[in-house]
């Protein structure tokens, strides 16, 4: 009933009456029919937005300006769509090859979450356009090999050698570690902007890498003399169960606004495969969504289906 205009005193004859909106929803005047059409298109389609819990009116307006309005569709050029498709094909082809070539070998595939790859590409491209010089990534096992191959540019030879128990690396200290613990670094160039990307090594302990990445970012910002905290971007990826269940996640959010720990914000990506090892969501958390922990820091949250890669990339662009 809260979604019906009648709840707020509107009657049927009000549906065609013009209302002055002063730019809200991207229009100056609109009747209830037009307003409802825009609201349904924005909030009842491919992306679910949570931002009304945020305390800063300017931050809420910033998000509204980018999602509400008759012209705020998810739009990509022909080349943009081809780039997204190309990355999806690369991600899926990589997983299929590993499944055929190394049957039964533990690899923590990205099956079903392939949209993560074009989303990361968008973050790198958009970040470079906005002046970012470095992107620090921390992530769990799930999809790590795919990210190493298709985002970081790690040679396939090195990845496949690790399946045979061989290490192609100058880092002798890392020999013998499992392939989905290893990190990498590389330089990527988009639109003439060079961005250095590094994926931090991490142990089997889920989410333990988070404060390491955040500390690296803080140090890099210091060396870049980046007082506005815009040159180095942290990106942390999570599984749904670990994000809600590991206390270190809440601790990092609780410290994020403190003067000694503030890094200007973090992009978090939750790859939600609806299960934590063997635990169903209803046995894993008390809240509806795993992302509810992020409300500690009044962070905006976007819910998007992984089978809609254009919507996923659109969210990455806003982030």
Protein language model regions, located:
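Short Gly/charged-rich anion-binding patches and loops
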Residues: 122, 289, 318
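Structural motif corresponding to the C-terminal cap of alpha-helices
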Residues: 92, 96, 124-131, 216-224, ...
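ATP-dependent adenylate-handling ligase core
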Residues: 309
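Structural signature of the thiamine diphosphate
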Residues: 312-319
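Active-site pocket-lining segments that scaffold enzyme catalytic pockets across diverse folds
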Residues: 97-157
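Cofactor-binding active-site loop characterized by glycine-rich and histidine/acidic residues
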Residues: 136-306
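Extended, charge-enriched "interface" segments that sit outside catalytic cores
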Residues: 1-116, 132
């Amino acid at each position: 009933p809260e979604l019906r205009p009648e709840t707020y005193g509107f009657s049927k004859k009000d549906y065609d009456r013009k209302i002055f909106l002063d730019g809200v929803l991207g229009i100056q005047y609109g009747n209830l029919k037009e307003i409802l059409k825009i609201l349904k298109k924005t909030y009842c389609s491919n992306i679910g937005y949570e931002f009304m819990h945020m305390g800063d009116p300017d931050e809420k307006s910033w998000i509204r300006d980018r999602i509400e309005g008759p012209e705020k569709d998810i739009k990509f050029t022909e080349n943009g769509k081809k780039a997204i498709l190309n990355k999806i094909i690369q991600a899926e082809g990589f997983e299929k090859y590993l499944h055929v070539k190394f049957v039964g070998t533990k690899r923590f595939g990205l099956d079903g979450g392939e949209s993560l790859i074009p989303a990361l590409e968008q973050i790198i491209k958009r970040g470079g356009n906005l002046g970012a010089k470095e992107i620090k990534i921390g992530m769990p096992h799930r999809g790590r090999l795919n990210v190493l191959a298709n985002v970081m540019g790690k040679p396939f030879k090195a990845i496949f050698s690790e399946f045979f128990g061989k290490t192609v690396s100058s880092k002798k200290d890392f020999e013998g570690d499992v392939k989905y613990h290893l990190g990498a670094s590389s330089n990527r160039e988009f639109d003439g902007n060079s961005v250095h990307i590094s994926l931090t090594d991490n142990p089997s302990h889920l989410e333990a890498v988070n404060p390491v990445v955040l500390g690296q970012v803080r140090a890099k910002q210091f060396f870049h003399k980046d007082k506005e905290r815009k040159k180095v971007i942290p990106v942390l990826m999570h599984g749904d169960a670990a994000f809600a269940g590991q206390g270190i996640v809440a601790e990092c959010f609780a410290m994020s606004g403190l003067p000694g720990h503030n890094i200007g914000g973090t992009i978090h990506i939750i790859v939600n495969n609806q299960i934590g090892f063997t635990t169903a969501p209803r046995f894993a958390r008390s809240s509806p969504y795993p992302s509810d922990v992020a409300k500690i820091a009044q962070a905006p949250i976007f819910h998007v289906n992984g089978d809609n890669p254009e919507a996923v990339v659109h969210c990455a662009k806003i982030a």
